[in-house]
Regions:
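Non-catalytic C-terminal interaction segments of nucleic acid-processing enzymes
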Residues: 222-310
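Short, amphipathic alpha-helical interaction segments positioned at domain boundaries
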Residues: 81-109
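Basic, Lys/Arg-rich alpha-helical nucleic-acid-recognition elements, primarily the DNA-binding modules
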Residues: 1-92
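Catalytic cores of nucleic-acid endonucleases
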Residues: 181-239
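Glycine-rich, often proline-containing surface loops adjacent to acidic residues and nearby aromatics
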Residues: 34-37, 89-100, 173-180, 211-213
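Exposed, interaction-prone assembly regions rather than primary DNA-binding/catalytic cores
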Residues: 101-193
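Hydrophobic, Leu/Ile/Phe/Ala-enriched alpha-helical segments that form helix-helix packing faces
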Residues: 28, 44, 56-63, 117-125, ...
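Hydrophobic beta-strand segments of well-ordered beta-sheets in folded domains
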Residues: 168, 173-180, 206-219, 272, ...
């Protein structure tokens, strides 16, 4: 059972999808709208190509309300299957505009890489839809104004979409994971722009006691190396045990956590302890904007002939 699907896959049983195929279609509709046969084979735990071919054919032949819901074509040198049917989104009770429209090569690459990372980390508490992300952060007391967003002009003038790149976000009780996907077609400043759009959200999450981790995902080693050089400058300086304890005690005072305060000898003793540690460490540590980062290279989506470091 994949927890973040929230049982949506069961809604596909009545149109002929068995459990595992229903989970796959739901994953794709939530995270990317398209996939490669290599990704499907990985999800099916190394199934042979004939079984994968049958699964794809079943999807391509499937009709909902007498209409086809998927197609397959060669894009970017790969055979890519796209689920576009509005009807399947309605069955799954997710916004039908999420991933079904045809789009640019850059967005296609970003979506495939996003799905690939999620497939390797299905255990994380993913927030796959815009509404789930917004609701989660609002429940944590974080206002919408602090979330990354895009305000649209033209016919959709005034429409606001939060987390407009639709890259994966997972939030648990102790840590939050934000995935940055580099499709290899942008500029060197895009990572900085993405980070700036998330900065205030990350500040609030860290103030609440959650660690913030950024994962940079790409299909070329040079893109991972470039992201790594930049992300190192975002990470908070390592604190000593005393500094960590002082930070914990400051939070206890701010939150009027009397149990913790009393366990350290009362309010006066806690204040004196904090002041003593501050005198020993007069130079404040750089808190950075995130607590840690990882680099993740996609072997299933890598550029043909490009080697990725394990």
């Amino acid at each position: 059972v994949i927890a973040h699907l929230k049982g949506r896959e069961k809604l596909l049983e009545h149109i002929g999808f068995p459990r595992q195929q229903g989970e796959w279609v739901t994953l794709v509709c939530l995270h990317s709208g398209l996939f490669t046969r290599d990704q499907l084979a990985f999800y099916l735990q190394g199934a042979n190509r004939f079984y994968v071919r049958r699964c794809v054919k079943a999807l391509l032949d499937c009709r909902v309300s007498s209409r086809l819901i998927a197609d397959e074509r060669v894009i970017d040198g790969r055979l890519i299957c796209r689920i576009f049917g509005k009807q399947i989104s309605e069955v799954l009770e997710i916004p039908h505009t999420r991933h079904r429209r045809e789009t640019s090569l850059e967005v296609i690459r970003r979506r495939l890489l996003s799905l690939d990372f999620v497939l390797d980390h299905l255990e994380l508490p993913w927030l796959p839809t815009e509404q789930e992300k917004v609701s989660c952060f609002e429940q944590l007391g974080i206002e919408r104004d602090l979330l990354p967003r895009r305000i649209y002009a033209g016919r959709a003038k005034g429409l606001i979409h939060y987390f407009p790149l639709k890259t994966p976000v997972a939030v648990g009780p102790e840590a939050a994971v934000f995935v940055y996907v580099d499709p290899g077609m942008g500029t060197r400043t895009e990572l900085d722009s993405w980070g700036e759009a998330h900065r205030r959200l990350w500040e609030k999450l860290r103030e609440s006691g959650r660690r913030v981790e950024v994962v940079a995902v790409a299909w070329e080693q040079k893109l991972l190396d470039r992201a790594g050089r930049r992300l190192r400058s975002w990470v908070a300086s390592e604190m000593s045990d005393n500094e960590k304890e002082a930070l914990m005690l400051r939070q206890a005072i701010a939150e009027t956590d009397f149990d913790t305060i009393e366990s350290y000898g009362g309010f006066d003793a806690v204040v004196e302890m904090i002041l003593r540690w501050d005198r020993k460490s007069p130079v404040p540590k750089d808190r950075g904007s995130i607590d840690s980062f990882r680099l993740w290279g996609s072997h299933r989506c890598r550029r043909i002939g490009d080697r990725l470091t394990k």
